[in-house]
A protein has these predicted regions:
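Short conserved micro-motifs at the rims of enzyme active sites and ligand-binding pockets
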Residues: 237-238, 276-278, 297-303, 318-327, ...
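Conserved catalytic-core segments centered on acid/base and nucleophilic motifs
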Residues: 152-153, 199, 209-217, 224-225, ...
Length: 393
């Protein structure tokens, strides 16, 4: 992130100057610096037809990932993948999400939004395991998309955790207030100011934000508003609470129309917010993805044990069919990829530095063709080994 380190090691409102902010965000994204991108629209990089060819080899994939990481860190802070998901698969997923939302409403437990007025939208919290348990085949077709793995590995490295919050903004739903995202973006200004300046610069590397369009999103439906390059403004977690900065955002944000199946991913420090749905009859649905580093903490708790068991049959079928990359992508979403925290009294590493992770266990089960009962037993045994035992008989 650009901007000088706060002189006392902590940011305060006095460090937030609009002139400095404008110097950071009022620049142009140069397509020539991103050879794998197809276009720049409103300062946002758009990727599409070039990707499959450029990622066909290990070396080519690494080059693309390095470019994506640079785009998120030092570039516009946001990238769009055109046609990232098969629209037919998206429609099947949307049916599952609508059924869950209908059940929430019938039960009187409709979910709201952090940054928008109540009643604007319908949301499913913690949708990964809900989706997998309800429709494992649809889940597998959906999360087999390589785009999530490509950019998640580029920004976070391996063993990341995907969480999901499908969100429907109804006609007339008002825009969100401009903000940054989790972690420091989910604190009030005083809480954020308690963290030292270096933490403000490091925390965006713990999370990747994404959104998959589940319907066509012309501008009148209110697709997400972005301020490209704003992730580079170091005191931004303090600044976005200021009306001076949100006012500037309101006058200079950009919106990109999206087609069903397009996906946008962005640095969580980017100033952004969902737009007003001015359409008469379009319920704008997006699957909001939050991908967390193995070194961080996700917002949603995911029952990865149940999700792994639910997908096991599908994983074995796809492995037998030679769809190995899809299986790896799905295991990265379904299972816990990091071995810690654990109870090292019980879960001791044997012949290696770390215990076996849940993702490694699931991959072994797929490769070796375990039956369902063996997987359930091994998952339960692993969970027991990982559970703290102090004070228990």
């Amino acid at each position: 992130m650009s901007a000088k380190t706060a002189p006392r090691g902590w940011y305060t409102p006095d460090d937030c100057r609009l002139s400095d902010f404008r110097a950071v965000v009022e620049q142009t994204t140069d397509l020539a610096g991103y050879p794998s991108a197809d276009d720049v629209q409103s300062n946002v990089l758009v990727y599409g037809r070039k990707l499959s060819e450029r990622t066909a080899t290990i070396a080519g994939r690494r080059e693309v990932q390095a470019e994506l990481a640079r785009a998120l860190l030092d570039g516009p802070g946001i990238v769009v993948f055109a046609g990232a998901f098969d629209p037919a698969v998206v429609d099947r997923a949307s049916e599952v999400f609508r059924a869950i939302i209908d059940e929430q409403q019938a039960a009187g437990s409709a979910a709201g939004d952090h940054f928008a007025p109540p009643g604007n939208n319908d949301r499913i919290w913690g949708a990964v395991d809900k989706f997998a348990l309800r429709a494992p085949e649809v889940f597998a077709d959906y999360y087999a998309s390589d785009v999530i793995a490509l950019i998640s590995e580029a920004w976070l490295g391996p063993a990341y955790q995907v969480t999901s919050q499908p969100n429907v903004v109804n006609p007339g739903g008002q825009a969100q207030v401009a903000h940054r995202d989790y972690h420091l973006g989910f604190m009030n200004r005083e809480q954020a100011m308690a963290y030292p300046a270096h933490a403000h610069r490091l925390t965006p590397a713990l999370t990747l934000q994404g959104a998959v369009a589940h319907c066509d999103m012309p501008v009148e439906t209110g697709p997400t508003m972005y301020l490209p390059h704003s992730q580079k403004y170091a005191p931004g977690y303090v600044a976005f609470h200021s009306p001076e900065f949100t006012g500037y955002f309101d006058e200079h944000y950009v919106q990109l129309p999206l087609a069903k199946g397009d996906a946008a991913f962005f640095n969580p420090a980017l100033f952004h917010g969902a737009g007003t749905n001015r359409s008469a009859d379009v319920k704008r649905m997006a699957n909001l993805l939050q991908v967390s580093s193995a070194f961080g903490r996700a917002m949603d708790a995911v029952d990865t044990t149940a999700t792994s068991a639910a997908l096991f049959g599908t994983l074995k079928q796809r492995w037998a069919a030679g769809r190995e990359q899809e299986v790896r992508n799905l295991i990265a979403v379904a299972a816990e990829g990091y071995a810690f925290p654990t109870n090292l009294d019980r879960d001791q590493p044997v012949g290696r530095m770390t215990p076996v992770s849940q993702a490694e266990l699931l991959a072994q089960a797929v490769r070796e063709g375990w039956d369902d009962a063996q997987l359930r037993d091994e998952l339960a045994a692993q969970q027991w080994r990982r559970t703290p035992a102090a004070g228990k008989q």
